[in-house]
């Protein structure tokens, strides 16, 4: 039994997540981390609470995999793995914060997630957004089957109207795919992840090959 207990403790240690922020961590003096919502190649998204306003929020942390490390049992600071990667990290952080500024321009648009704050801390950067309570369009289709063209048009109307405003500002969203669209419990539909948005006058050959997502990329990219 002692051996089994030790094995169980070892297994729990191995499974423990040491790189994301721990539950209860406070950011910027007001945002309390509650849970990890998801993780991608460039960041970690948390569910949190704004102590000042008393509302639930989503907090996106710039955490590019393979470039940084953190041991949350010691502190919350993110460390760049190799000195030669520092420039890459800093450029990425600048673009990450620019994402916040881009989304904030469209906070009055019903079909786009709202940004409420952004800041730097722990040697990295954070974007605070409204918490979206629902499922992605991808998940909805997996559960309910393919939607008719009529249903899709009705569902996507707020997003399409918001994208029209985005395009008027000289920006395009490079990934309007089902996993980037949230269907909320209150019936609203929101487009997420504006890290895939950029000025459509600034396409280079290299960036096109990296970011073009067949089937979901805007036609401006195919013409560039």
Where is each model-derived feature located?
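Protein kinase catalytic-loop region centered on the HRD/HxD motif
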Residues: 160-171
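Activation segment signature within eukaryotic-like protein kinase domains
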Residues: 155-156
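Conserved short submotifs of the Hanks-type protein kinase catalytic core
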Residues: 122-136
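AlphaC helix of the protein kinase catalytic domain
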Residues: 137-147
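Conserved activation segment of eukaryotic-like protein kinases, specifically the C-terminal portion
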Residues: 207-221
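Activation-segment/catalytic-loop signature of the eukaryotic protein kinase fold
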Residues: 118
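AlphaC helix of the eukaryotic protein kinase fold
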Residues: 73-105
